[in-house]
Design a protein with these regions (language model features):
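Short alpha-helical donor nucleotide-sugar binding micro-motif in glycosyltransferases
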Residues: 347-352
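Short hydrophobic beta-strand element within catalytic cores of glycosyltransferases
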Residues: 368, 377-380
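Aromatic "clamp/platform" in nucleotide-sugar-dependent glycosyltransferases that forms part
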Residues: 360
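A short helix/loop element that forms part of the nucleotide-sugar donor recognition site in Leloir-type
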Residues: 239-255
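Conserved acidic donor-binding segment of nucleotide-sugar-dependent glycosyltransferases
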Residues: 392-393, 397-404, 413-418
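Conserved donor-binding/catalytic core segment of Leloir-type glycosyltransferases
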Residues: 256-272, 278-281, 294-296
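A short, well-ordered alpha-helix in the C-terminal region of glycosyltransferases
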Residues: 406, 413, 420-434, 446
Length: 455
């Protein structure tokens, strides 16, 4: 048996999102190497790291596995519209898949419909052309996976967009499917339910984020190998911001040091339910007239026009939030600066009095862990998977996402009692230690080994 496992990752969202297309890069730099070396480009100008929980978990995990000599430098195959085909960066070999101009929006519509139904937002319309584009995308990924098969011992496939990969790959190599969104098939259409269950059953093993989702997997009739692993983060990557950075951040967002700051870190998407926090803010605004609601984040890979899928849902939701804030007369208290870098995100956590995770339904949400790393109290919707880690009145609060008044009451409690909030944040930090990447490395390595040995 090899001392190092050869891993190939497959996800829809790429680790790198290019702001310039391949031909724009050629025009700017002349001849590019093949594979293209990311060190030859400029971060923030030519490319950026894709935001989101999936990519922020995968990359640190791969780095740690390489450092510990558990795996060889892996391949990562993902969807990269107009991106260079082969990219080399650090411990990664990136391969980008493209869809043509006709198929890309069709693929996007199908996977968005599937996403909405799986998040209980209503039944999807099955359009044959959209399904064909979705299947084409999965087949293009499978073809690239076959191409790197001689350098692969194990495929590690991420999230629902890749659901057909296990069926397409078949018995060629062990394949683990990491499902990141809620696995609750009880209230979806039989057609979609069967589609999900049949395809999930084609993988050698499935990993879900929460106990809720593991129970949902079993309840749906899945009989294969299944694991539950809470999402994780690298605790050591977070550094305390300097006073100068903090002052500059406050000044840029026009927040006073005396203001009470309620923060949500999430992409601008209806499923993140920022509207509940706006309603809660209106409920407490007379008691805390200087309170600010800080909504950090912009669109996802799906909504990005540069290097993404250009779906309009992010802009539509942002417009609704701004309109709702105006309707409730709290528009001057709601701050939406868009995407911010990790170093600014650490500053945002540091100035916050409370972190809210209001999602009506969500797979997990790493914001809960990140807030605890910064010793901040959290208020988490019972619809978010991370609520499983919240012990009421110890490391935070939970609330019913159908009751924004409960959210408002719990925000008020924390703002009124800052000493209790500090104690909650300290307890939260102890909880966050359980989600450190070093623990995850051991668990993931064990899952890899068990799956390989079963073959």
């Amino acid at each position: 048996m090899r001392s190092k496992t050869r891993i190939t990752i497959n996800s829809q969202t790429p680790f790198i999102r290019f702001k310039l297309g391949y031909f724009e890069l050629v025009e700017k730099y002349g001849k590019l190497s093949d594979p293209m070396n990311l060190d030859d480009l400029h971060r923030g100008v030519d490319y950026e790291l894709s935001p989101g929980g999936v990519t922020s978990m995968i990359y640190p995990l791969l780095n740690e596995l390489v450092k510990e000599n558990k795996i060889e430098i892996p391949y990562w195959i993902s969807l990269g519209p107009n991106a260079p085909y082969n990219v080399k960066t650090g411990n990664l070999n990136l391969i980008n898949i493209s869809l043509n101009e006709k198929d890309l929006p069709l693929y996007t519509n199908f996977k968005e419909g599937l996403w909405r139904e799986l998040h209980l937002q209503g039944p999807m319309d099955i359009n044959p052309d959209e399904y064909e584009a979705f299947t084409k995308y999965n087949w293009y990924c499978a073809k690239k996976l076959f191409q790197v098969l001689p350098q692969t011992d194990l495929y590690f496939v991420h999230d629902f967009q890749q659901i057909q990969i296990g069926n397409l790959i078949g018995p060629s190599a062990p394949t683990i499917f990491r499902w990141h969104i809620p696995f609750k098939l009880d209230n979806i259409s039989p057609l979609v339910r069967n589609f999900i269950l049949k395809n999930v059953s084609c993988f050698d093993a499935v990993v879900v984020s929460t106990r809720r989702d593991l129970e949902g997997l079993v309840r749906a009739g899945y009989h294969g190998k299944a694991f539950q692993l809470y999402p994780y983060t690298d605790i050591n990557k977070w550094k305390k911001p300097s006073r100068g950075k903090t002052d500059a951040f406050l000044s840029r967002l026009k927040i006073k040091k005396s203001d009470k700051v309620i923060t949500i870190v999430a992409r601008i998407d209806a499923i993140k339910s920022q509207d509940l926090a706006i309603a809660a803010l209106s409920q407490i605004r007379h008691k805390f007239p200087s309170a600010k609601l800080l909504l950090l984040g912009n669109g996802s890979f799906t909504g990005s026009r540069k290097g993404g899928l250009a779906h309009p849902k992010s802009k539509q939701w942002k417009d609704k939030l701004l309109s709702y804030a105006k309707e409730l007369k709290v528009e001057k208290q709601v701050i939406m600066p868009g995407y911010i870098k990790d170093e600014d995100l650490a500053t945002a956590y540091s100035i916050s009095d409370v972190i809210v995770v209001p999602s009506r339904i969500e797979g997990f949400n790493l914001t809960t862990i990140e807030a605890w790393i910064h010793r901040k109290p959290v208020i988490v919707s019972t619809g978010a998977g991370s609520s499983e880690l919240v012990v009421e009145n110890m490391n935070g609060y939970v609330f019913d996402p159908n009751n924004h008044s409960e959210l408002g009451e719990k925000i008020e409690l924390l703002l009124k009692h800052p000493e209790a909030a500090i104690k909650m944040g300290e307890q939260g930090y102890l909880t966050a230690l359980q989600s450190d990447i070093n623990r995850a490395v051991k668990t993931v390595t064990a899952i890899f080994d068990e799956t390989l040995q079963a073959r």
